[in-house]
A protein has these predicted regions:
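Short, well-structured alpha-helical segments in soluble
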Residues: 1-6, 64, 116-135
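Short loop/turn motifs at secondary-structure junctions
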Residues: 3-4, 69, 136, 186
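Extracytoplasmic ligand/sensor domains, especially the bilobed periplasmic-binding protein
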Residues: 5-104, 165, 176
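Hydrophobic alpha-helical
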Residues: 14-20, 133-158
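Extracellular/periplasmic periplasmic-binding protein-like sensory domains
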Residues: 44, 50, 107, 114-116, ...
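Short hydrophobic segments within beta-strands
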Residues: 75-76, 142-143, 169
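Glycine-/small-residue-rich active-site loops that bind phosphorylated ligands and cofactors
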Residues: 81-82, 109, 147
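Short, well-ordered amphipathic alpha-helices
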Residues: 87-91, 118-125, 151-155
Length: 190
C-alpha cells in the first residue's frame, strides 16, 4: 500500500487479517476489519470491527439485565440454525455466572403451535377467567426477527405474562430499519 494510505477497510477473511498482521500493516494504518472477532488484544488497539459479533450481542443484553439486577432468564428460540446458535451462546454466557435458565423452542413457520409453547414457557394457568403466569425468570432472550417478535408477544400476554424484560439480537434492528412506524404498545420492556 502507498504510504499516504492511512486507513484500511477490510479484510473480509480471517486468514487475510493474519497475513496483514504478519506484515505489521496495522502498526502504521488504521484497520477496520469486516470480521466477527479479532486476534488476541488487537481489537481497539491496532484494529477495529465494523459490526457486532453474536457474542457482542449476547454480552450487551446480559450487561443490560445485570445492571437491572436480573439473574434468572428464559430463552424462547426458533428451531432454526440461527436461533439455536444464538441460544447456545446465550446459555454458555449465562451459565458461567451461575444464573438459571428456562428454555423453550418453537418452529418458526408454524404459528399454530406457539400458544402451547408459550403456556409451557411461562407456566400459564387460569384463575377463573384470568391467565396467571408462574414463570420464575425475569427476562426472556428471543433470538428471532422483529416480525416474529410482534407475533410472539401477544401469545405471552394471552398467558398473562407482561412482566418480562425482552432481549433480542441485531435481527430486531434489521426488522425495524425499513419501518416508518412501530406499534410499541406491547413492547414496553423490549
Amino acid at each position: 500500500l502507498p504510504p499516504q494510505c492511512v486507513m484500511v477497510g477490510g479484510p473480509l477473511r480471517a486468514d487475510r487479517y493474519t497475513a496483514m498482521k504478519s506484515r505489521s500493516i496495522q502498526q502504521s494504518r488504521a484497520v477496520f476489519a469486516f470480521l466477527p472477532s479479532l486476534e488476541g488484544s488487537d481489537e481497539g488497539t491496532v484494529a477495529w470491527r465494523f459490526f457486532a459479533s453474536p457474542q457482542d450481542q449476547i454480552d450487551a443484553v446480559l450487561n443490560f439485565t445485570r445492571n437491572l439486577g436480573i439473574s434468572s432468564y428464559g430463552v424462547l428460540a426458533p428451531t432454526d440454525t440461527y436461533g439455536q446458535r444464538m441460544t447456545d451462546l446465550f446459555l454458555k454466557a449465562v451459565r458461567t455466572n451461575g444464573s438459571t435458565v428456562k428454555i423453550a423452542t418453537y418452529p418458526s413457520g408454524d404459528t399454530t403451535s406457539w400458544g402451547e409453547v408459550m403456556r409451557g414457557f411461562v407456566g400459564g394457568t387460569m384463575r377463573g377467567k384470568t391467565p396467571v403466569p408462574t414463570s420464575t425468570f425475569q427476562a426472556a432472550f428471543i433470538p428471532d426477527s422483529w416480525k416474529n417478535l410482534e407475533l410472539l408477544v401477544p401469545f405471552l400476554f394471552y398467558q398473562g405474562e407482561d412482566r418480562l424484560v425482552l432481549m433480542g439480537t441485531s435481527l430486531w434492528e434489521q426488522g425495524l430499519s425499513n419501518r416508518s412506524s412501530v406499534n410499541v404498545a406491547n413492547l414496553d420492556l423490549a
